[in-house]
């Protein structure tokens, strides 16, 4: 039954690594010699007692290990001068010397006195005598094997030569921490850098809980917003109200600004000046009242309100001139009202000759007031040469043959109208008659 345990015992820790606290560890009865279980000695080696950092806690550790084991016959069969307890209790040795271990850990305590070491040795001897006198047999050996191997399995995971002492101390610390606080709530765990207080929440996380619960803006009553904000009192604001409050320091006004009305929404709109309801463009005056385009533009240009007498029922549009007006206009033949009837046959022949060439002549438009600037002496009279026309024949240009410049002015019996020159004679383009100021085109 204990063959597997016996094989594990051969590879276990050295005898000094076991603790002498188990009641079955000190049972050496009749069946103990035949049992394959190894029972270590509970005596503390002299090398251990000579260590300075264990002198103050040696007795406390030994007695504490006895109390940390099973509460069997060894606990009831302890010596008369030994009091079992935890490392934090005061113990009395066989010689009556009082010993009070440190409250935290015997390993890090100050070196003890010589009396405390003697008390520890006496307590160990008393426990050994009690264990040998408690009797036993095969059952006691089996119990010792179970207890010893159970403790060996627990202590074998440590690399320190005395793990059982510190294990009991650590167990007492864990029990004290569990009694004082809840599980996983010790100050050691809270001191870790990776662990934060769950109650402390980042303030910016509130802005990301948009859809976690039904929120409403306390200013405008909005239920949804891209970003929830808070005012100075902690109330929720939508992004628009919160940003407005942050920039201006006041609450965002609930009245929305009036949007520009479309044509369908301007049915009941009328001009504040002329009370018209139809206009191409609505304007506003200095007081902010709507005015029509005519009244608004008149006020802008003249600085005074538009008179009501200028009001028209229809909308006056701009009269634009066609761009191809000069191209479409063709010079027509001169009418009879513009030319005077000739007084002689020579003038009639010349008028007929010049009429045929009127398509090549351009009419000159002048103002009537220009006639006063030209006197009788400065006027250039032109005569017609009939012989020139008859001598040269039709081969000569009719305009050149019909005009003959005379350097001296003379009084003609018949008042002849001045003739317009050809395109080559630009200096003779303006000639005015004495009788009237109209432009005559031959």
From Swiss-Prot:
Assembly information from the UniProt record: Interacts with ZNF260. Interacts with the homeobox domain of NKX2-5 through its C-terminal zinc finger. Also interacts with JARID2 which represses its ability to activate transcription of ANF. Interacts (via the second Zn finger) with NFATC4. Interacts with LMCD1. Forms a complex made of CDK9, CCNT1/cyclin-T1, EP300 and GATA4 that stimulates hypertrophy in cardiomyocytes. Interacts with NR5A1, ZFPM2 and TBX5. Interacts with TBX18. Interacts with GLYR1; the interaction is required for a synergistic activation of GATA4 target genes transcription.
Subcellular location: Nucleus
Full protein name: Transcription factor GATA-4
Comp. bias intervals (Basic residues): 317-326
Gly residues composition-biased segments: 60-82
The encoding gene: GATA4
ZnF region ranges: GATA-type: 217-241, 271-295
Modification after translation (UniProt): Methylation at Lys-300 attenuates transcriptional activity.
Organism: Homo sapiens
GO BP terms: aortic valve morphogenesis; atrial septum morphogenesis; atrial septum primum morphogenesis; atrial septum secundum morphogenesis; atrioventricular canal development; atrioventricular node development; atrioventricular valve formation; cardiac muscle tissue regeneration
Described purpose of this protein according to its UniProt entry: Transcriptional activator that binds to the consensus sequence 5'-AGATAG-3' and plays a key role in cardiac development and function. In cooperation with TBX5, it binds to cardiac super-enhancers and promotes cardiomyocyte gene expression, while it down-regulates endocardial and endothelial gene expression. Involved in bone morphogenetic protein (BMP)-mediated induction of cardiac-specific gene expression. Binds to BMP response element (BMPRE) DNA sequences within cardiac activating regions. Acts as a transcriptional activator of ANF in cooperation with NKX2-5.
One Pfam family hit: GATA-N
Reported impact of residue 407 to Q: In VSD1 and TOF; uncertain significance
Domain of life of the organism encoding this protein: Eukaryota
Any GO molecular function: DNA-binding transcription activator activity, RNA polymerase II-specific
Residue stretches of biased makeup (Polar residues): 413-428
Effect of residue 296 to S: In ASD2; decreased function resulting in reduced myocardial genes expression; fails to down-regulate endothelial and endocardial genes
SUPFAM superfamilies: Glucocorticoid receptor-like (DNA-binding domain)
């Amino acid at each position: 039954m204990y063959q597997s345990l016996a094989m594990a015992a051969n590879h276990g820790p050295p005898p000094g690594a076991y603790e002498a606290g188990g009641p079955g560890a000190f049972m050496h009865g009749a069946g103990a010699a035949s049992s394959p279980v190894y029972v270590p000695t509970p005596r503390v080696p002299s090398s251990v007692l000579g260590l300075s950092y264990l002198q103050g806690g040696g007795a406390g550790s030994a007695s504490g290990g006895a109390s940390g084991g099973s509460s069997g016959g060894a606990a009831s069969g302890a010596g008369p001068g030994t009091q079992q307890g935890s490392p934090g209790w005061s113990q009395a040795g066989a010689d009556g010397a009082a010993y009070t271990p440190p409250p935290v850990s015997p390993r890090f305590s100050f070196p003890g006195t010589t009396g405390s070491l003697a008390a520890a040795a006496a307590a160990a001897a008393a426990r050994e005598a009690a264990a040998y006198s408690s009797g036993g047999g095969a059952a006691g050996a089996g119990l010792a094997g179970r207890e010893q191997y159970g403790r060996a399995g627990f202590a074998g995971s440590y690399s320190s030569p005395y793990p059982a002492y510190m294990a009991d101390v650590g167990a007492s610390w864990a029990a004290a921490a569990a009694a004082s606080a809840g599980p996983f709530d010790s100050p050691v765990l809270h001191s870790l850098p990776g662990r934060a207080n769950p109650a402390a929440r980042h303030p910016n996380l509130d802005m990301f809980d948009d859809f976690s619960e039904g929120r409403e803006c306390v200013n405008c009553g909005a239920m949804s917003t891209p970003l929830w904000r808070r005012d100075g009192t902690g109330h929720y604001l939508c992004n628009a109200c919160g940003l407005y409050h942050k920039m201006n320091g006041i609450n965002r006004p609930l009245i929305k600004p009036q949007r520009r009305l479309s044509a369908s929404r301007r049915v009941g709109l009328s001009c504040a000046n002329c009370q018209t309801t139809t206009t191409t463009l609505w304007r506003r005056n200095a007081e902010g009242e709507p005015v029509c385009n005519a009244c608004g533009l008149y006020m802008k240009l003249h600085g005074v309100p538009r008179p009501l007498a200028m009001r028209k029922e229809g909308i006056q549009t701009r009269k634009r001139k066609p761009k191809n007006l000069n191209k479409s206009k063709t010079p027509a033949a001169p009418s009879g009202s513009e030319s005077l009837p000739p007084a002689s046959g020579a003038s009639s022949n010349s008028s007929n000759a010049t009429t045929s060439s009127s398509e090549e002549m351009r009419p000159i438009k002048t103002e009537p007031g220009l006639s006063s600037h030209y006197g009788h002496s400065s006027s250039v009279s032109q005569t017609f040469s009939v012989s020139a026309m008859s001598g040269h024949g039709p081969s000569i240009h009719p305009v050149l043959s019909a005009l003959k410049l005379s350097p001296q002015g003379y009084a003609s019996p018949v008042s002849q109208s001045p003739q317009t020159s050809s395109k080559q004679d630009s200096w003779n383009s303006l000639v005015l008659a004495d009788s009237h100021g109209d432009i005559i085109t031959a």
